[in-house]
Amino acid sequence: MGGGRLPPLWLPLLIAWSEWGNCCLDAPPVVRSPCLQPVRDRNRERNPGSPQLLPYGDRLEVACIFPAHDWPEVSIRVHLCYWPEIVRSLVVDARSGQVLHNDASCYIAGGRWRFEDGGAAQRLSLSFRLITETAGTYTCVLGNETHSLATETTALVADVHDLRHSDRSCDLAFGSRSQTRYLWTPDPSRLRSINCGWEGERHRVVHYIPGTSGLLPSCEEDERELCVPFISQSIADNNCSRRHRVDGARRRYHLRRDYWLTDPKIGLLAAGSVALTSLCHLLCYWCSESYRRLNTEEESEAAEETAAGEASAVAAAAVSEEEQRRE
């Protein structure tokens, strides 16, 4: 064998497999790549418009379409809900189609990527199985020598954990249309729930859309900071929140009825408000009375002056007539 050691038989298969992005046998990261740098303030990553709840465990594809050869680098930037502080990136040279950096498909369950040059447009896609660990935001990013530009962001949610209090029942309702900031699913009738039991005084329920793979979400609790805003905004108008508002109104009614006289702070606040209101009314009454009295005095003085003037005129006329008679 010439003293050299032949590579194992599986190495060509592994190299061929890596062309589809299943392995991380790509070039080392390009540290100065614009697509790996933070997006500038004027080109911040766009907020996802409509987080989607899709079938759990099904394979889906996130595709980014770019104008051909307008940008030297194209990328898909991934923020996973389980690790929001870690950013994964798939960066491809738009001219040659070679991968420059890839730590996205390696850490995503069943992750595969593909780059296609269609002449007028280029397409970079990342496919994977949607499970709890792959939920997050996927952002299309363009890069040149100076900066990067985020063009589109897709938010995907695999499951929703709901903690319910024992004295309140909730009926979560997800929308069937894409609405800004609200979680939606193409077919709400397929929504299913898993009963995860009680945690103290709260009942844990996991909502999901069953997929063809048969995979089910776990009942294990996790913060998933990135997905929490999507979920909390999405369920803000469901029956649970309406029931919560009714309960809050009932509590406020009992507060006004039962605790008005027993809480000294409320009594002092009420007494101060009544005293301040009474003082304002007294000041207004005093000002109005003073103004009315002043106007009355001015009018009486003007009337007296007018009467005196008229009397003087009558006397002068009488004197002049008397003088004319004497003449």
Swiss-Prot record:
The keyword Oxidoreductase does not apply. Residues 305-319 have a biased composition (Low complexity). Glycans are attached at residues 144, 239. Residues 298-327 are annotated as: Disordered. Keywords: Glycoprotein, Signal. Residues 1-23 form the signal peptide. InterPro entries: UL141, UL141-like_sf. It comes from the Viruses. This is Uncharacterized protein UL14. The gene is UL14.
